[in-house]
Amino acid sequence: GGSVDSAAAEEVFESNCASCHGADLSGAGPDLTQV
C-alpha cells in the first residue's frame, strides 16, 4: 500500500538524507529546499 511505502521512504530519509542535510534541511549537504 501507498501508506507503507510512504512510511518506509520517510524512514529512509530520516536515517540517510537527514544525517547529511540535517533534520531541518540546513545541514552540511546540498540545500534540498531548492530542488
From Swiss-Prot:
Q: What is this protein called?
A: Cytochrome c-550
| Signal sequence extent | none
* GO MF assignments: electron transfer activity; heme binding; metal ion binding
Q: Which InterPro entries does the annotation name?
A: Cyt_c-like_dom (IPR009056), Cyt_c-like_dom_sf (IPR036909)
Tell me the classification of the organism that encodes this protein. Bacteria, Bacillati, Bacillota, Bacilli, Bacillales
Q: Give a single Pfam family match.
A: Cytochrom_C
Identify the PROSITE patterns for this entry.
Answer: CYTC
Q: Which domain of life is it from?
A: Bacteria
How does the record describe the protein's post-translational processing?
Answer: Binds 1 heme c group covalently per subunit.
Q: What does this protein do?
A: Monoheme cytochrome which functions as an electron carrier in the reduction of nitrite by membrane vesicles.
Residue sites binding heme c per the record: 17, 20-21
Q: Which UniProt keywords apply?
A: Electron transport, Heme, Iron, Metal-binding, Transport
